[in-house]
């Protein structure tokens, strides 16, 4: 059991350098810092509460006057112009300075009951809250000034600006910035100055008591925790209802009930501020905290509305055409499911900004505008002329139809003058459409460049254009239009020519005239000649290759025959010379055994095709000897070995002793080099070798 207890103890004991011990020590350190911060915050909160109660008791000693609570009800604020403001006996500065010193890690401002009192109306307040407020807040009625309704508006604005991302506040600030010349930041600063001046005048004795009190200095929590907590606290702030980055200009509306302007303070608030802030460290701290808070928490919308830029001026002047959001485009709950995508531009709409920028660079005198361009919400008229195929076709078709009608009219009038009768009033109003029905479709005729006949097309013509066409169509203008049409579309045939006029009523032009038979024959002949020449050329090439192959084979046969005959003759001569001292019997046997006869099949096995065709019974040539050469072998029946006379041991020894000093080159001469191609004319390796390219004979 001892070993088990030791093992358990080892498991529980921490090794000094292990990862577990490091992580646990880090956790302990982290817990220490967080616990210390929470303790410090608790102590600070208690000390601030104690200090606030002491200051409040001191103020009661200084002032023995009766205080009353004056609350604002929503009914009185709407109907009456004069509103009583409650006095804040130094609570604003004290609460702000102490709350800034006692901020916890989350950095969320702690609003006491006295702060809620000045914002929430009496009718909307709960009973418990009012009782708690009555305990801690007593106000002087004798010193309460009388202010108009706009001062109430300023306080409401202050309460709204406590949340910088409020959509109602942003809307209100934008409206006020467009109505009045002053920016909302300037009005806010002015209101703060008046407020501070009043409070400084009233809180002189409190500030003297505060000078004696020592300010508690505490190291603030780390910045990472502040940033994280601030991010988490601002996570669920509702987004604005409208696009905040676009300032829309709203013209001032004349209301029936005119609101009087805020009266300026008789005494300068800046002078009061200078007098009081010379020897007041508490107010300096309050001001520093106010300025720091205002710079950090100042709204993006306030900053943008106070400092107008060139891009905002351009957006206001343009009227904000393309970026229109519906009321439900940005959801207040923050869910992306209800977001509506922006309306994209139509495909045919041009980029107007690019065209306006390039207007001075590419300026053309003769501008051709599009007649059938879609006039959507996002499309504007382009200052740069653009050639569109459809519009060009329509314009050319219309103009051609007008010219055709004019020619018809002039021709008809000339025929009438010839006959002597009065001409009928024929006008080109046949093409025109009534002004009441501009959507009617009219058939125009234009001449196709491929075929000679006229083809009807449909084109919509506006009534205003038809009036101009009917009134201002003169021969001079028609000529000018014809010239411009020829420049624009040179492929279109000229209608004024007699050939085109004839082809209008000529029925056979609808049919395609076939070329004559002779031309077809010539074409066919050329094609066939081409084909035949190709076939003939290939046949000739094949025949030429065959002939060359046969020639090569015949040359090889001749060379082989020469080589075999030369070798046979050479062998015979050498044998005769070497075997001169031998007996005739021995020489005859050697000749029989070693002679290479050319009358058998093996001599011509590589040159002659000895295959027999089935069914082809042809008499064999008598000259060819198909018999194989005789090879003398020992009979199997004989037990002893029969050897030639020169092969017997005593005779052989004599011959070897005699021939040991003989040089073979003196007898045989120089030995020629051995070529395998000469011995084997068609080996298998020759097939794998690349063929030599034979030059073509021209």
Swiss-Prot record:
Region entry Disordered, spans: 365-390, 405-444, 455-474, 535-560
Gene Ontology terms: cellular component: chromosome passenger complex; cytoplasm; kinetochore; kinetochore microtubule; mitotic spindle; nucleus; spindle microtubule; spindle midzone
Superkingdom of this protein's organism: Eukaryota
Annotated positions of the Phosphoserine modification: 268, 489
Basic and acidic residues biased stretches: 550-560
PTM (free text): Phosphorylated by serine/threonine protein kinase IPL1.
Location(s) in or outside the cell: Nucleus; Cytoplasm, Cytoskeleton, Spindle; Chromosome, Centromere, Kinetochore
Keyword vocabulary terms for this entry: Centromere, Chromosome, Chromosome partition, Cytoplasm, Cytoskeleton, Kinetochore, Nucleus, Phosphoprotein
Subunit structure: Component of the CPC complex at least composed of IPL1, BIR1 and SLI15.
Family stated for the protein in its record: Belongs to the INCENP family.
Stated role: Component of the chromosomal passenger complex (CPC), a complex that acts as a key regulator of mitosis. Stimulates IPL1 kinase activity and facilitates its association with the mitotic spindle. Has a role in attaching the kinetochores to the microtubules and ensuring that sister kinetochores connect to opposite poles.
Protein name as annotated: Inner centromere protein SLI15
Species of origin: Saccharomyces cerevisiae (strain ATCC 204508 / S288c) (Baker's yeast)
Protein encoded by which gene: SLI15
